[in-house]
Amino acid sequence: KSIFERDRRDWLVIPDAVAAYIYEAVNKMSPRAGQFLVDISQTTVVSGTRNFLIRETARLTILAEQLMEKIKNLWYTKVQGY
């Protein structure tokens, strides 16, 4: 399988990984500022926005996968004649 088929959902974890790296860096410099980031990340606005983005990104990923399957089927049936 190509890298796109094998790892196509792994990119969804990138925002969480970036947030974790930022938290670790800030927490090493100032534990108080790190705690502030934790408190902010647990507010309803931030968690609601995060959940919305995850839900919509997952929906778009599924739609993109379905589109790729349709294109593949079209390619095999109409262009190559299988």
UniProtKB/Swiss-Prot annotation:
<dbReference type="GO" id="GO:0045735">
    <property type="term" value="F:nutrient reservoir activity"/>
</dbReference>
<keyword id="KW-0758">Storage protein</keyword>
<dbReference type="GO" id="GO:0042627">
    <property type="term" value="C:chylomicron"/>
</dbReference>
<comment type="similarity">
    <text>Belongs to the apovitellenin family.</text>
</comment>
<comment type="function">
    <text>Protein component of the very low density lipoprotein (VLDL) of egg-laying females. Potent lipoprotein lipase inhibitor, preventing the loss of triglycerides from VLDL on their way from the liver to the growing oocytes.</text>
</comment>
<dbReference type="Pfam" id="PF05418">
    <property type="entry name" value="Apo-VLDL-II"/>
</dbReference>
<dbReference type="InterPro" id="IPR008404">
    <property type="entry name" value="Apo-VLDL-II"/>
</dbReference>
<comment type="subunit">
    <text>Monomer.</text>
</comment>
<dbReference type="GO" id="GO:0004857">
    <property type="term" value="F:enzyme inhibitor activity"/>
</dbReference>
<protein>
    <recommendedName>
        <fullName>Apovitellenin-1</fullName>
    </recommendedName>
</protein>
<keyword id="KW-0850">VLDL</keyword>
<dbReference type="GO" id="GO:0034361">
    <property type="term" value="C:very-low-density lipoprotein particle"/>
</dbReference>
<dbReference type="GO" id="GO:0006629">
    <property type="term" value="P:lipid metabolic process"/>
</dbReference>
